[in-house]
């Protein structure tokens, strides 16, 4: 269906070719799984952050990431999958998240979740910017909400990176985290 010379309306999965459905589903699944697994990892740091303020901030970030995962998983339900099938009943090998979000944290080092957050959030900023003009409105409509919350996440990580790098020991810890995590952020 077209509007007087405009591009076709792509409002539902049935408006897509099989190839397009497969591509959209794969893209959205990876985005949902990234958010879900990262949120799960962040919960491991709750009550272990260096300050009460940072603990609360990381809890808020984890909650936001769960919310973002829910936005993307809800979209996947349009393609016939249920939330239970996508998350709770899924075989772990069926998850399509980035290795960066899955890696265990370096034991007891706050630099690890902070640098991981920064690397992922910079990637996500670029990824979401690329999706702002998606021809599939069900993706495009979700991007703005996620972007507004991700701005807070990036600022939180940037502020902590500055604090951690304020002294030689902190810079060394951040560098160690970068040596470990950066290859997975590429």
Region locations from a protein language model:
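A contiguous pocket-lining binding segment that forms or flanks enzyme active sites
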Residues: 138-186
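Terminal catalytic/cofactor-binding subdomain
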Residues: 14, 18-45, 53
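Conserved alpha-helical segments that form or flank metal/cofactor-binding pockets of metalloenzymes
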Residues: 61-92, 157-165
């Amino acid at each position: 269906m077209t509007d007087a010379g405009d591009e076709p309306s792509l409002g539902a999965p049935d408006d897509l070719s099989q190839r397009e459905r497969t591509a959209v589903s794969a893209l959205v699944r990876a985005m949902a799984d990234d958010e879900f697994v990262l949120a799960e990892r962040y919960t491991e740091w709750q009550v272990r952050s260096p300050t009460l303020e940072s603990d609360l901030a990381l809890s808020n970030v984890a909650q936001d990431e769960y919310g973002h995962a829910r936005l993307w998983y809800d979209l996947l339900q349009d393609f016939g999958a249920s939330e239970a099938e996508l998350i709770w009943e899924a075989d772990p090998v069926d998850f399509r998240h980035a290795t960066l979000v899955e890696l265990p944290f370096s034991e007891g080092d706050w630099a690890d979740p902070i640098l991981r957050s920064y690397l992922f959030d910079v990637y996500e900023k670029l990824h979401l910017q690329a999706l702002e003009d998606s021809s599939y409105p069900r993706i495009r409509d979700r991007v703005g909400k996620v972007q507004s919350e991700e701005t807070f996440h990036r600022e939180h990580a940037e502020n902590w990176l500055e604090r951690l790098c304020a002294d030689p020991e902190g810079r060394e810890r951040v560098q160690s985290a970068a040596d470990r995590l950066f290859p997975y952020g590429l």
